[in-house]
């Protein structure tokens, strides 16, 4: 039985990096929500409720500095410090205001693409066109109000791909895209997301020519994935496409090869700094609180004083027994974690943060 959800080995290998970068760039709330994934629990063998509560406090006090996300935004801004020049023929003028059919212009798609490259090393561009009868002239084309759209795809949503040699050229012959469609509930207000897979193929026809096909897979009542009827897109002349209108976009080149995301080293250091912060804030919490003590007293004095109330401060008289004394104990500050934080902070600045 074929499995449309099968994931390319390179996808499986790189997915943890992409998810880590997404969490780190999203900020403190996303990182802390992952709990022990990014902040190991001290005394992890202790599964008691008390240790669980202690860990929650340990995580809450920790500070995650959103260095990686800020750096990503700064780099995108630097890339577009000078407005890029887009040149479109009149038939594609809509790309300047609505390139993807959802209101994003080509300029905004380019900005999002740079952001994907920084976080995931790559993204993808996929060109689609509504299923309409091919227009015979420009007037008919305008009446249809059907425009080609450019879809920018996150690397996480392209789960599988393959290529083959055709006429001494390497061409993509398979692309599997994970998609989510929205379905409104019967009440007219609620909404749920439904997962589906769009499969782009390059398949031989009866004459041995390779043509582009599209097939969408949805989950049936029995929980199995079922492919809908294949569609055979055609160009303006009604001819089948001889290639898949899809391309990977990489930080270095546009090949299928995946390399480490540019921001990964900074994200790893950002998380290490977060763990040091948890240890430092823990020491600040405990060592920053003085502990009062009394000596030369017995339990009878303590019980009587507790009954009447023990007050410490200016203009307050605290009766003590003969040879009694009151003092304050405070631990020496632990600066090791603080020094580790400073060291990592300097290294992050060296990386361009």
Locations of regions flagged by a protein language model:
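Extended, helix-rich architectural segments
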Residues: 1-158
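Extended, regular secondary-structure scaffolds
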Residues: 118-254
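Short linear motifs in intrinsically disordered
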Residues: 113-117, 128, 163-166, 199-206, ...
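Alpha-helix capping and helix-coil boundary motifs
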Residues: 102-105, 164, 168, 261
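Extended, charged amphipathic alpha-helical segments
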Residues: 226-353
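Intrinsically disordered, low-complexity segments enriched in small/polar residues
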Residues: 25, 33, 67, 75, ...
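N-terminal start-of-domain structural block
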Residues: 1-43, 212-255
